[in-house]
């Protein structure tokens, strides 16, 4: 008798995706982050659902409703901090996942890669709108500054901003629609994840060597399910430590002050995971130029497959490209630090140099170094 998981219409889809899926035998722990992201998304949707049961999206009561969740709702504090710090964990896994894709040349699967970029934009939009909901000082001013960037779009900019605000400033209408979108977007992200997996399973996984692994495949279960469970446990330990010992470590103290349109905080900044893009935005004196640079800082990932001229897929055997990759990581960390600093000397010039370097690495240095490595292969 054939096993039900191989015959049942629904179970056989799950079976072919997570049980009997042929996977390369050489996958390292860098391939854990896909499943960790799925776990993060599940945690965010569950905690978010319970938070939404107690939250009110009205400017008069939003801040108090968050305080009420933390003080009066059973285990409301842990729900709130799991949700807030779960977002940080989500972005850590997301950036490591993208970094792994860049390092090992996974971007050559262009459909999977492009859906991944869409996912990145969708998750960033969700996180931004979620940051506005507690209606603290940084929520309000962050929403004002970031949405106002759209006014840089020629001709339709001002109308577009007022349309998003639902009025002439960030107010009740803005908060209500941001809550609606923040609730809806994770489900759109879940649908995009399915598409991402669909395209991935069309081609099969890449592996650290970048060499086709068809002759050497092993079943996903039990080998990689066990490996993923270990990843879950490590991430859960880190998240629990963050939530239980220093829940406000990654937040902004200004967000514990209720939103006040008459009082601007001394330094407006987004959450830490957007600081690199915020630093790139600030490093360009022109408003439209800054907005374009901000969008391009993420959209540049879509150009990476077109600039891949190396004869080898992975960076595993390309030491020059490896140096460049770690330079890129250093530049990103520098930009993240600069994004959190005030706009003054020497931070401005450091931010500008790092921003130029960021784009140069992608557009000039990577292809150049690949060409040099191709030449060295002839020796």
Curated annotation (Swiss-Prot):
CDD domains, per the entry: cytochrome_b_C (cd00290), Cytochrome_b_N (cd00284)
Cofactor field: heme b
GO molecular-function terms, A-Z: metal ion binding; ubiquinol-cytochrome-c reductase activity
Alphabetized PROSITE patterns for the sequence: CYTB_CTER, CYTB_NTER
Coiled coil: none
Binding positions for heme b b562 per the UniProt entry: 83, 182
Chain ranges passing through the membrane: 33-53, 77-98, 113-133, 178-198, 226-246, 288-308, 320-340, 347-367
Keyword Cell wall biogenesis/degradation: no
UniProt-annotated location(s): Mitochondrion inner membrane
UniProt xrefs under Pfam families: Cytochrom_B_C (PF00032), Cytochrome_B (PF00033)
Positions that bind a ubiquinone: 201
InterPro entries (alphabetical): Cyt_b/b6_C (IPR005798), Cyt_b/b6_C_sf (IPR036150), Cyt_b/b6_N (IPR005797), Cytb/b6-like_sf (IPR027387), Cytochrome_b (IPR030689), Cytochrome_b_C_euk/bac (IPR048260), Cytochrome_b_N_euk/bac (IPR048259), Di-haem_cyt_TM (IPR016174)
One GO CC term, this protein: respiratory chain complex III
Keywords: Electron transport, Heme, Iron, Membrane, Metal-binding, Mitochondrion, Mitochondrion inner membrane, Respiratory chain, Transmembrane, Transmembrane helix, Transport, Ubiquinone
Cofactor note text: Binds 2 heme b groups non-covalently.
Binding site for heme b b566: 97, 196
Keyword field contains Nucleus: no
Protein's GO biological process: mitochondrial electron transport, ubiquinol to cytochrome c
Note: Heme 1 (or BL or b562) is low-potential and absorbs at about 562 nm, and heme 2 (or BH or b566) is high-potential and absorbs at about 566 nm.
Subunit structure: The cytochrome bc1 complex contains 11 subunits: 3 respiratory subunits (MT-CYB, CYC1 and UQCRFS1), 2 core proteins (UQCRC1 and UQCRC2) and 6 low-molecular weight proteins (UQCRH/QCR6, UQCRB/QCR7, UQCRQ/QCR8, UQCR10/QCR9, UQCR11/QCR10 and a cleavage product of UQCRFS1). This cytochrome bc1 complex then forms a dimer.
General function of this protein: Component of the ubiquinol-cytochrome c reductase complex (complex III or cytochrome b-c1 complex) that is part of the mitochondrial respiratory chain. The b-c1 complex mediates electron transfer from ubiquinol to cytochrome c. Contributes to the generation of a proton gradient across the mitochondrial membrane that is then used for ATP synthesis.
Family membership: Belongs to the cytochrome b family.
Protein name: Cytochrome b
Species this protein is from: Brachyphylla nana (Cuban fruit-eating bat)
Gene: MT-CYB
